[in-house]
Amino acid sequence: MNSDLPATGTVALLELLDPLVPDDFINQVWPHGRTGGRHRAHPAAQLFRVHLLSLLSPVHSLNLLVKLLPEQRAWRTCAGRRRQSRVPDVRMLHEFRARLGVAGLRRINQHLLQPLVEAYAWRQWSVGLIDATDLPAACGGFKKSTGHYSARRAALGGRTLKSGQSRCFVGYKKHTLRLWLHDYTVGVQLVPLVSWVTPANVSEGGLLAPSLHDCQRQWDWCPPLVVADMGYLAAQAKRRCREHWPVAVLTKLRSDMKLVAPYVAWNQAACPQGEPLAWLGYDGRAGEHWFGAPAQPQLCGQCWEAARCPRQFAYRPEPHETLLGRLPLASPMAQRVLQQVRPWIEPAQSYEKHQLGLGSVFLNGLRFTWAMALLADAAVLLRARALLERPIPRPLLSGLMPVQLSLELGADAARSVLPTTNLNPQNHQ
């Protein structure tokens, strides 16, 4: 998440993001009208800005933020409240979250995401990344009287074993499908398309299809290539994504999985006689992958079947969705994406948990956790829009710097995502 923007938590970043907050949209959807009872002292946009301050400022507590607002003029300016005596209290913030709900916060994020999707997503080689991150709950322990943890809807779940962390934790998980803005060449920029928050014991793979369905319903589009980790190995979910939406879900192969023809290794395909095969493309009409011998074969000249061998072989993806899914692992594109794109997800998760402070918030309920997770997505979207609207700096020594972010997917991606490609040479005769 390194960029030319000011550091997160500084007043300079707040001033930069201030004009990008959609105040008119928020006030129009949730108007500041009569309630039939106590009058609302603050418009919806101002309360939304106060919630953003809990992530964009060094104070990651709403209770402490309310107490510090009268002392911080820059924070009050960002929240739209210049008077010290007219700051919202904790009750107002709670009522605002109850009024918007998860659907309302998602609607705001979709409004922020719309120009990014229109500008960057409509490409044949758009790449999405999906993963889950752990959010430990502020839990005092397991209550024997109720049979539940003190944090509402918290559960015992597992996470990737890292130094200084235990294998299990009590809390929640944030599942996010992100889009890589590949036209931004200065650095890697990921924006969240859709996020879910569940108890920690919910499997990651079960939210793959709902995430793509939500993108298709909202934008009439979903990324044709999704990179995931080992938690999304389920063949049934991959088959559903391949059949309902022409989406290739790329994951690595588990070590105990068996190989199927034409694979002799997880990244190498070969004919029955041992000649290495190259992936030629996917025939969307027949639903088959075509593999062929290279231009200069090694074993075809000595093969006893050379006279009748077509040197091109078709395989359907149903026998193994990981090896022969929408995009086979033997293709150079799949290997390049898994090696280069997959590690980008960890810095994005680390930015939300540590710099935005999502991991430091007092998460004592599933509903509150979901609201703060969507607010973190809103902060990332605002930051991405501010970054894309700034002029791209061109260092004087740019020609001497190594290029580390090039990912040429044009030719291979076009062959993999076009469903009408006919790669069978016999059909032209």
How would you name each of these model-derived features?
Residues M1-S57, L62, A74-C78, Q84, ...:
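Dynamic "connector" segments at or just before major functional cores
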Residues D18-V21, P70, Y263-D283, P328-L366:
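Short amphipathic alpha-helical "interface-anchor" segments enriched in bulky aromatics
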Residues H32-G33, R82, R97, L116, ...:
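Nucleic-acid-interacting cores, centered on viral/eukaryotic replication and modification enzymes
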Residues S57-L64, H182-T185, V380-I392:
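Short helix-capping/linker segments at secondary-structure and domain boundaries
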Residues K67, L93, A98-M230, A234-P246, ...:
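Polybasic low-complexity intrinsically disordered regions
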Residues S255-V260:
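Short gly/pro/ser/thr-enriched loop/turn and capping motifs at secondary-structure boundaries
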Residues A265-L329, M333:
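Cysteine-cluster motifs in flexible loop/terminal segments that predominantly coordinate metals
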Residues M333-P419, Q426-H428:
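Basic, amphipathic alpha-helical segments enriched in Lys/Arg and hydrophobic/aromatic residues
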